[in-house]
Amino acid sequence: MQFYQIKLKGKAFLTAFSFLLCSIGAISQVNTVEFGKNRVQFRKFKWQYYQTDNFNTYFYQDGQTIANYVAQLAEQELPGIEQFVEYSLQRRANIVIYNHFDELQQSNIGLNLDWQTTGGITKLVNNKMIVYFDGNHSNLRRQVRQGIARTLVDNILFGDDLGEFAANQALLDLPKWLTDGYIDYVAEDWSPELDDQLKSALLSGEYKNFYHFAYEKPLLAGHAFWNYIAERYKPENVTYFLYLARVYRNLNTASQRICKKKFKEVLREFMAENEEKYYLDIRGRRNFPKGTISIVEETKHNKDFIRFTPNPAPRSQTYAVVEYIKGKYYVVLYENLVDRKVLLKTGVRTNENEVNPSYPLLAWDGKGARLACVYWEAGKVKLFVYDLVARFKRVKQDITPFEQIQDMKFMLNEKSLLLSAVKNGQSDIFIYNIDKDDFEQVTNDSYADLDPSFVAFPNKTGIIFSSNRPDPSIKGRDTGVPVDRFNIFLADNYNKSEFRQISRLTDMKFSDARYPMQYNTSHFTFISAENGVANRYAGFFSTERAGLDTIYVIGDNFLRNPDQRDL
């Protein structure tokens, strides 16, 4: 792998006079990348890149660790994707990495190109795939696989040359949901999360037929269609179906050859069979735990509710929610279920439906008296803490130490926050002091550490979290490619030494373990789809006299079968 630096010259173009840093000698190369000036940019990007056999991986300040991972990952994933789509990469592709979603939003690359995709799938512009890091290597891997798959599929369908691309795109009239769905199918296996999204969509009663469904949710509809073809008509017929559609320029002909039916009939069967399957699934589910209050929000086509945070105080009728309307984010506080107060309005109005996966974040303190909110504005991570008793924002400040924050909870007092955050391209656990604007680092490695929560068991207190580290004691390498499943770990909270004790609480082989939390004085819970359905598992932690930590996971006793929206 070779390392290059890029120097900026001119306003509209990025010209790279790069010199290879190695003992053999210097090799000069030139690369031109178009940049516009239509979006507000809050920092200057000093671009560098790694060059491998098949990819140029571009990154900027604080992104070297991520780029190192992506460069190796792309080379590792390429052969399998080439084999699946039955086509090889013809020339070196470019991967442009942004450190997080908000800096991706500042990008002008390919802003005016009609075939740039938006809304859930990796953007591709002239053989440049654009990805971002949200702190989770699994999501980054999916984006890289999507980008590789789109590069290969676009070359198959439309050709490698730009002029040929535009001409063939006009001639080959395949539905966008079909091609984007195929790319997503190649990039990501069908999962319980996708299955839950499909179930919610089909049982909502909003869609008259498949075309209506594909118009509203094209990526989900396309991915589900190809998964249906694989299950009903064999996996090897997925790529063959797309090949026939391209050759004959007719979906009916391809459908007749593979399914022995017209294309519309296949789509009708898709809707009918899946609806019947999900109705049977609902009948077999356990009842929800009994509660005292149900909160129902009226949904609208132009409004999404992306985060819901109830007040933890007993018998409280207060909750906070983030509303998203065409690029604008509203943090809204509801008291007594009806009194509405907008605490924050941020974002820029746009028709693009790209919801920020990270911000705003909400968290209540243990007493339910203060609400913390972390959000992104004007190129900075910002924090405010709203006091429900005094009815004003006690804290309004920038959080300077971190590049992005994925998760936030209050510690035992209102002055400290427990964070999963990215610093120097690594996702780690931190305890952040609000008054001093400094932090204590709990973990420090290249593995993703997510979903932290403070727990207290008999003879043991600490921070429980989800991580893809292979071993509790291992220190991650910046050259490693994390591939392990997410499992639950417990870090000693009071050991301040460099070698903080970390215990492994789960050993999931086939699915990730996420969202751990304390259930009672002896049990913790987490979500996993180990058996193919997302269930909440329970386990308990005990310490023997010899000082050995023993973990007991109740693998067959599910507390409930939650829908994805409840996680």
Task: For the regions a language model picked out, list residue spans one by one.
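N-terminal signal peptide c-region/cleavage motif recognized by signal peptidases
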Residues: 23-25
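Predominantly a core beta-strand signature of beta-propeller blades
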Residues: 290-295, 339-343, 391-396, 437-441, ...
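Beta/coil-rich, acidic/histidine-enriched accessory regions frequently appended to metallopeptidases
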Residues: 31-34, 38-39, 47-49, 213, ...
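A flexible loop/linker signature enriched in serine peptidases of the S9 family
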Residues: 196, 322-332, 349-356, 372-384, ...
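Conserved beta-propeller blade repeats
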Residues: 141-142, 174, 301-318, 348-374, ...
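Bacterial N-terminal signal peptides that target proteins for export
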Residues: 2-14
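Active-site-proximal alpha-helical
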Residues: 81, 153, 174-264
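Juxtacatalytic substrate-recognition/specificity segment
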Residues: 28-168, 175, 192-193
